[in-house]
């Protein structure tokens, strides 16, 4: 997979909840060891990210910038932990976060193109591109996937994603070869492009468990994490 660093967290219990606890504890410790003053850090959202950030200690560093890598507003009353993750992460790094006060996927490319032209939104997007560290997880295309519970997709779109994709990074869905699985949905997605992740000094994927194996493989084949 051409990775520069791999960390493996062991869970004595094969259940996903146990794996998630050990994984996020290890990830929190790992992030504490690599973040330094002056870093620009882009971060995604989701349960894994929230657990990881919650377990981090407050770091005595300065001049760090934290930016959200994708929109975070949900259409349904399901918590994606976007705001909580971002603000808590920034607080532990003695800074304020730059946010996307928007849904991550809009109904049309026209709407998305108009939104990203806004100077405030474009500033956040550009800061995400400038980030030297990106921290994210992979989602799955199983029915219980957070994206499918947040109201972003029609039934036909959800069906197509389940058939053609293996997972997502920053709400950009890819197939087993790491290629974008639906260009139309991708064109309406607000946030960092997957190709931008390849340029990062540290592109950090935090994920584990049987349910995410295909998504992890696709992400690594695509070269989105190093």
Model-inferred region functions:
Residues 72-226:
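Conserved phosphate- and dinucleotide-binding cores of soluble alpha/beta proteins
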Residues 1-109, 213, 221-226:
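N-terminal active-site beta-alpha-beta segment that forms phosphate/nucleotide-binding
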